[in-house]
Amino acid sequence: MFHFNRCQHLKKITQKCFSSIHVKTDKHAQQFLSRTFALAELRKSWYSTHSLVGDKNIILMGPPGAGKTTVGRIIGQKLGCCVIDVDDDILEKTWNMSVSEKLQDVGNEQFLEEEGKAVLNFSASGSVISLTGSNPMHDASMWHLKKNGVIVYLDVPLLDLIHRLKLMKIDRIVGRNSGTSMKDLLKFRRQYYKKWYDARVFCESGASPEEVADKVLNAIKRYQDVDSETFISTRHVWPKDCEQKVSAKFFSEAVIEGLASDGGLFVPAKEFPKLSCGEWKSLVGATYIERAQILLERCIHPADIPAARLGEMIETAYGENFACSKIAPVRHLSGNQFILELFHGPTGSFKDLSLQLMPHIFAHCIPPSCNYMILVATSGDTGSAVLNGFSRLNKNDKQRIAVVTFFPENGVSDFQKAQIIGSQRENGWAVGVESDFDFCQTAIKRIFNDSDFTGFLTVEYGTILSSANSINWGRLLPQVVYHASAYLDLVSQGFISFGSPVDVCIPTGNFGNILAAVYAKMMGIPIRKFICASNQNRVLTDFIKTGHYDLRERKLAQTFSPSIDILKSSNLERHLHLMANKDGQLMTELFNQLESQHHFQIEKVLVEKLQQDFVADWCSEGECLAAINSTYNTSGYILDPHTAVAKVVADRVQDKTCPVIVSSTAHYSKFAPAIMQALKIKEINETSSSQLYLLGSYNALPPLHEALLERTKQQEKMEYQVCAADMNVLKSHVEKLIQNQFI
């Protein structure tokens, strides 16, 4: 058996020691166990010394032409450790012939077996190992390597690989047969690389080997530093004594808890990760799934969700359940306006882009010994999206995770209500509340902060409460992807070059969607202005113009765009916290004042800072219907009422000096009566499915949403509960549902 030891004393790169992990004993008693066990395994498998590698190996993986050998030598020099090239140092010495001769001698399938056997008979410690391009295709040998090192995937753009292989005059690699192009083979190989890596280095076009080597070392440092990426409450007050430990949460804890114990919302303690211009350019030709994997890996530490597992979740979330293979395509409407279509998911709204992924994240993060009840308040679209998303979990997860969604009984469209009711499954229920969305949302926050009630549920039923509204970081984060992807699509389609600015116009109620666009800008997307579009419930427009958030004498109006019929915009707190340099004391004062006095005023300096990036206006009901009518008549495209609100505002305030991406947040068929009124179609008092067929007969763009049509057929057989607008009544419903599901 081959065995390599460290050639010399390793250079110490870090001296970070671990402190013990303490498990809280309050109402969130067991929420940390899942990550604690993961960290224990990570530390046990990696930290044999305080140096960067210790006795473990750095294993470089990637396709032929990725630069594994060259980069490995540079890293070996930097760390002063042994460098092993599997081709030269293992295979050829074992076989006494060149790799190409062996491949020609035994053929593709037998070559993989022979290669795997050679690797299984090899061991090393404290070394840099450069794999062959085909090593990851042999499971047993990869498990053998993985248990004694960290695998770093050198992810090189496909066109760069093909160019390099031509220069290297390599035209035969394992698996390539006559009639198989190099491009197709390299694409096929990706599935194996994605299966094994612990950390990915995204190699932008033109990056030098030295730059890639530095990225590898940084990726390993991040992989080791399991305590570096934490979350704090927006109401967290930084201690004056810098030596005092900051109360922070890991990503998995933030997802599980949903709302901070002090009533604030979780946000990253540090800055958002930023991609370089070259990295963004390398994503221009990528698919939505590939973009999501790169971006979310940067935002979620592998100790919370291993990169390969996260990739599996993303592929599951954005698969055949979306009617469009592009997931969130961008369509040119007219002039400088583009429509970002966010309604191709199973429930026809932008909420699907988060809620097809978030349940898988949640199920991964929670410990296996606890039950969880997800409480959701919906203004229309969230309810059905949450119920649909959590219904797609596997059988075991559905037995320990249940959902109840509260919606305003008379505050959503008839179709939305039908859709929410029709989305009920064995682990999800809908409850109508005789009030508005703001009551539903506030009630859920109060339930979370009722420690007596939540503690009782934990002790009596072994059940912990959590949320899937956009107050939950795991729900908000995936929305960043589609804003970034929309910009990349404009570059890909040739409308702009990378670096050119764009504006985004977003129909806004709870501030989550537009906040995700802010985070996309922080990651490097050049968004110039965020245009906040309100309907008659224009509290956000007034706030952006004046800095005064005033709910006094303001009553919620029911409009054609019910999903933004919101007065208390929860995610605004996150943005104000960001603008105020993470001043938790200020957030506590402002939002306590909002709760007690129903208004607050921010200082002039914050108003000016807000207005540097934000523009806002509102749209009347008549203007909304007129926009739907005129857009259809000029382009054959039907806007839903929320998108129409955004278009009216974009037409009014955008200066047309750069493209504006209008977020289309729902499919028009969810609001058939309003659409028929706008198009001056004589409204018929028939079923929702009949209305959809009627609209479908117009052959407009976008086409009829088949999943919505199927859902309307199901709901007519479903029942649901209605309750009074009373906190105690809602709590009683929650307890009864827990009894039915988990006892």
Curated annotation (Swiss-Prot):
Cofactor(s) of this protein: pyridoxal 5'-phosphate
CDD domains membership: SK (cd00464), Thr-synth_2 (cd01560)
One family name in Pfam for this protein: SKI
In-chain residues carrying the UniProt-annotated modification N6-(pyridoxal phosphate)lysine: K351
Record PTM N6-acetyllysine, positions in chain: K281
SS bonds (residue pairs): none
Matches recorded under Gene3D superfamilies: 3.40.50.1100, P-loop containing nucleotide triphosphate hydrolases, Threonine synthase, N-terminal domain
GO cellular component term of the entry, any: cytoplasm
Keyword annotations from UniProtKB, A to Z: Acetylation, Pyridoxal phosphate
Classification via InterPro entries: P-loop_NTPase, Shikimate/glucono_kinase, Shikimate_kinase/TSH1, Thr_synth_N, Thr_synth_N_sf, Thr_synthase-like, TrpB-like_PALP_sf
PANTHER family: THREONINE SYNTHASE-LIKE 1 (PTHR43515:SF1)
Protein family membership: Belongs to the threonine synthase family.
Protein name (database record): Threonine synthase-like 1
Organism, scientific name: Macaca fascicularis (Crab-eating macaque)
Lineage: Eukaryota, Metazoa, Chordata, Craniata, Vertebrata
Gene assigned in the entry: THNSL1
